[in-house]
Amino acid sequence: MDPEQNAWTRRHMLGMDGLARHEIGAILDSAQAFRDVNYREIKKVPTLRGKTVINLFYENSTRTRTSFELAGKRMSADVINISASSSSAAKGETLLDTVATLQAMRPDVVVLRHGDSGAPHFLARHLDAGIINAGDGQHEHPTQSLLDLLTIQDHLEEMGKSSFEGMNVAICGDVLHSRVARSNAFALRTLGANVRFVGPPTLMPSEATKVFGVTVHHNMEEGLRGVDVIIMLRLQLERMTSAYLPSVREYFAYWGLTRGRLELTQPHALVMHPGPINRGVEIASDVADNPNRSVILEQVANGLAVRMAVLYHLCTGAARNSAQLGESL
């Protein structure tokens, strides 16, 4: 790829909506270079020495927060973790007041997870630092989408494909409350994949076809037939304010990914899940642990490399291609 075309020029990583193919490619190329670092005996590089990264989490998240913390530290950045429960936010401080406090610290990047959609965009308008959206309400979760893309890309050859073009991907479950579903729909469509939302009508956004350009299936068997990739989503009961389904047991009976339903997909189909997994609710244990089909643990491992890549581009404004980055590591 032409280095000029592979340049990353954005100040923030707020979402997958609007990112071009070459921008997604720049992150994935860099992530592949950083992945090698994580397999060295000494898993540390001086890439972000002297840079300050603040992880500001208003919602709990073991995987995402730990992944961002480790990503920053492995690149020698100074990393500060702030959780809402232990910060002034718990005492009534507004997000705008928090912005003023952060501005005084002069960080290079702020990683924000927040329960309100649009909160990272608010920070980007008021804070002189790069902002990474680590999940905002039901809006987007771009780094989860990027690690999903990297995981799929790793398996293109065994799937008999050279790119995402024409790939069939089913995103199944609680799509309504899922920021992961939204980010993946935007990204996969940009890369040329065909995306299906599969789930009960009560858990499907009304704007699915118009906004995301996907096809919608309310029958699990129909939605899974012939797909190359399955991305299962958990039921986000904490975001449900009314009865969206009769019972968890009935949900699994109709919408759970079982071995029998997996057989409806392509023989090479990948099983993915952003976590945390609810076994026996959206996915059966023998499917989640299937060594030939499940790549769930690969997703976790790739998350670290992707977040290193995003921090690298935002902190350095780097427009290097992957070969140049690899030489510098």
Swiss-Prot record:
It catalyses: carbamoyl phosphate + L-aspartate = N-carbamoyl-L-aspartate + phosphate + H(+). GO terms for biological process: 'de novo' pyrimidine nucleobase biosynthetic process; 'de novo' UMP biosynthetic process; amino acid metabolic process. The keyword Transferase applies. Its EC number is 2.1.3.2. L-aspartate binds at residues 91, 179, 234. Carbamoyl phosphate binds at residues 63-64, 113, 141, 144, 275-276. InterPro entries: Asp/Orn_carbamoyltranf_P-bd, Asp/Orn_carbamoylTrfase, Asp/Orn_carbamoylTrfase_sf, Asp_carbamoyltransf, Asp_carbamoyltransf_Asp/Orn-bd. The keyword Transferase applies. HAMAP family: Asp_carb_tr. Heterododecamer (2C3:3R2) of six catalytic PyrB chains organized as two trimers (C3), and six regulatory PyrI chains organized as three dimers (R2). Catalyzes the condensation of carbamoyl phosphate and aspartate to form carbamoyl aspartate and inorganic phosphate, the committed step in the de novo pyrimidine nucleotide biosynthesis pathway. This is Aspartate carbamoyltransferase catalytic subunit. It comes from Magnetococcus marinus (strain ATCC BAA-1437 / JCM 17883 / MC-1). The gene is pyrB.
